[in-house]
Amino acid sequence: MGTEKTQPLTLICHGESPKFYEIDFDLDGLRVHHFNPDIEWAMFVAWNRRVIPERFRSHYDEKFLPIARSSDVIAGKIANDRMVVVLDWFFNGFITDVGLLMSLQALGLGDQYCALTPEACSHAKVVSEKALSANECANLRAKSENQRSLAVKMVDRIRLEHRRDGIFFSEIIEQETGRAWT
């Protein structure tokens, strides 16, 4: 669930019989942890995607499990098909934290919400449902590819402009855990 309508549309357009659901998600009474668009958010994404090497996992388990266990909803910037390229570059040492954060800001992503508990799920109500035609899906796929291409060019420019600014993913892990990467 998210605030940016295009994000789920470009994902579902690859399915056989895609349907788009508009959802009303009432957060009142729920325990919501909202990640700011910062390095903690990126490290949470890395932890969830199991990108953090196993030898460092326990540190991040101690950091993020309490957040996940005490929340009905986790919210943060959408890690969509445009952002996944940037995240991969960050996780693989092609850009620093400065490049990542500048890219995150430049991409202008909406927020996404993950309902973690039955209570949170009960707060989500389907408002409308729309089946997508083959033509709509083709247009969405083309739009998605175009957006991804433009995003990669923009992020590559940011990467080059800030290649000496900040620290890399492995260095963040070293600093946070007090252990050497190698």
Q: Positions of the model-derived regions?
A:
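Extended catalytic/binding region for NAD+/ADP-ribose chemistry, centered on the ART fold
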Residues: M1-C13
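Conserved NAD+-utilizing ADP-ribose enzyme module
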Residues: H14-K19, L27-T182
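Surface-exposed, glycine/proline- and aromatic-rich loop segments on solvent-exposed faces
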Residues: E22
